């Protein structure tokens, strides 16, 4: 039997304005130094309460949906909810594109559960990294420097007035992309993510061009001609263009035109009556 309350949550995509890898750890994970930025492309989760369990309906075929893992991690770290959920997931964010769609969905569910069960956000952030390395960022959202495996978040004042064009392609998996890196490529960025943030904040085009960096761009472009062509195509009408994450999406930034814009949030929550 369904309950009467529910929510509609927008879970926003992200791009990496800056992405470097600083080292490979003994446990096999890589540590990053990045500048994350949410954009106005979003998935929508329509959540209603049911008696028990988790039911997910979606408009795309997703194997091993991260929402199941999110529910399990939440239940094992906190008291299992005395209610179940039915989630209708409307996917608009391309998958396996470096846009963080799955992590954003996970953060949206964590946000809902923490709100319903009155769990402080700082406790939710601590378990978020167990679900995925980008999930902690989406619980904070907006503009942030991200370090470590993704669990160290430094929020920054929002960057507004920028527009984004995206092109997706057939890419390679994140694991394969990291396997293309070696330690000689680490820490080779021309400046820091903080310097790039200041350039965006002050609309300094020359510095934006100088400081924009993605460690994966050269190695992925060598492997994937389509991605290399997409980067070149977007550069014609953009301040800068590069990969987000390890791809396959490529973005271009401009002041006046684009399909999406920067937004100061990771998720947007609205309670509804069903």
Curated annotation (Swiss-Prot):
Active site positions: 14, 134
Gene Ontology molecular function terms on file: 4-(cytidine 5'-diphospho)-2-C-methyl-D-erythritol kinase activity; ATP binding
InterPro entries, per the entry: GHMP_kinase_C_dom, GHMP_kinase_C_sf, GHMP_kinase_N_dom, IspE, Ribosomal_Su5_D2-typ_SF, Ribsml_uS5_D2-typ_fold_subgr
Chemical reaction(s) catalysed: 4-CDP-2-C-methyl-D-erythritol + ATP = 4-CDP-2-C-methyl-D-erythritol 2-phosphate + ADP + H(+)
Alphabetical list of Gene3D superfamilies matching this protein: 3.30.230.10, GHMP kinase, C-terminal domain
Source taxon at top rank: Bacteria
Task of the protein: Catalyzes the phosphorylation of the position 2 hydroxy group of 4-diphosphocytidyl-2C-methyl-D-erythritol.
Name of this chain's protein: 4-diphosphocytidyl-2-C-methyl-D-erythritol kinase
Gene symbol of the encoding locus: ispE
């Amino acid at each position: 039997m369904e309950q009467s309350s529910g929510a509609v949550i927008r879970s926003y995509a992200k791009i990496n304005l800056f992405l470097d890898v600083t080292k490979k750890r003994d446990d096999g994970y890589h540590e990053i130094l990045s500048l994350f930025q949410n954009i106005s492309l979003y998935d929508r989760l329509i959540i209603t309460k049911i008696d028990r369990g988790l039911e997910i309906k979606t408009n795309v075929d997703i194997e091993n949906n991260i929402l199941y893992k999110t529910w399990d991690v939440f239940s094992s770290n906190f008291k299992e909810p005395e209610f179940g959920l039915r989630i209708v997931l409307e996917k608009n964010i391309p998958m396996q594109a470096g846009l963080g769609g799955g992590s954003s969905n996970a953060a949206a569910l964590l946000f809902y559960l923490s709100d319903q069960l009155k769990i402080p956000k700082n406790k939710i952030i601590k378990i978020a990294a167990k679900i995925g390395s980008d999930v902690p960022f989406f619980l904070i959202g907006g503009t942030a420097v991200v370090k470590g495996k993704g669990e160290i978040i430094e929020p920054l004042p929002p960057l507004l007035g920028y527009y984004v064009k995206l092109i997706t392609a057939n890419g390679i998996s994140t694991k394969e992309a990291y396997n293309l890196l070696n330690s000689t490529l680490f820490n080779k960025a021309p400046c820091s993510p903080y310097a790039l943030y200041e350039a965006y904040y002050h609309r300094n085009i020359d510095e934006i061009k100088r400081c924009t960096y993605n460690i994966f761009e050269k190695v992925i472009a060598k492997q994937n001609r389509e991605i290399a062509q997409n980067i070149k195509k977007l550069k014609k009408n953009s301040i800068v263009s590069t990969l987000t994450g390890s791809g396959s999406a490529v973005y271009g930034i401009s002041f006046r035109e684009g399909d999406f814009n920067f937004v100061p949030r990771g998720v947007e929550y609205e309670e509804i009556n069903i």
